[in-house]
Amino acid sequence: MKLSKVVTGTAVVALSALVLSACGSSSSSSKNSTSSKASSSKVVKKSSSQKQVAGGALKDGTYKLDETGYDHGYKVQMAMTVKDGKITSTKYDYVDKDGKSKTKDAAYEKAMKAKVKAGPKEYIRELNKSFQKNGTNVGAIDVISGATDSSMTFKNYAQQLIQAAQAGDTKTIEVNNTGKMQDGTYTLEEKNYFNGYRVTFSITVKDGKITESNYDNINKDGKSKTLDTKYEANMKKVNKVGPKEYIPELNKSLVAKQSPAKVDVVSGATHSSDTFILYADQLVNAAQNGNTNKIEVDNIVYNN
């Protein structure tokens, strides 16, 4: 999967806020064998100068997520501690059936580094560091070169932990990562509007395959961003693409590729593509568990 890095621009045109909303608000059990790590650390300082303007506060406690299946002999274990409403420590690891971390697998480290120039000792530490730096701003977590799928999986799970912390639900999240998707319709919706729009997203699974993907951005009247001709024209002037093009393209790509990790990032709509993949990953996890309850995301919105 091609992944471009999100660049927070210094655009001063009045259009910038409008265009950035196409890059949305803030994925994946689908990861390649490059996923591995053991990293635990305390948050030293706050992420960026961006100010949170919407989204639920985090409730104090320790929140955990575990994969239930072993992939290439390892499964993810992840935890996040919140104190005084702030993330104070994070832990992310891949363990084998004996509880041994993949970071201690010297053969794996050597083989992966030879192929993609980054091994679990490096990218796990970097992902954890980025989580510490950016806190609840999951969209700002770095995608590590050579470990793209692992990075997107990390972001998906970090997002789920943040949602749990907003709800104060300390029950361990279990991800049936090696399970088949069960038939049904799975739905996710954002609660908060960013530049006048919020995400609505559903996938339909039949015979274990995604047959429909309905991702959209709607305003308070329920009108799709694809129908906003002014927005379309303004965004196309700057990014050469608008919601009328990138929204159906993302939906089409998910049905064709059957995996969020394989969805192509639409040039000019990188942030929206990343958000799409993040939420698609969460919907796939729901389908693997057969949980058709609507996922309500009290999405955290930052000022531009």
Which residue stretches match the model-derived regions?
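Sec-dependent bacterial lipoprotein signal peptides
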Residues: M1-S21
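Bacterial lipoprotein signal-peptidase II cleavage site
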Residues: K5-V6, S21-S47
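Active-site- and interface-proximal helix/loop "cap" or "latch" segments in soluble metabolic
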Residues: K51-D60, D66-K180, E190-N304
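Cofactor-binding beta-sheet edge motifs in enzyme active sites
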Residues: Y186
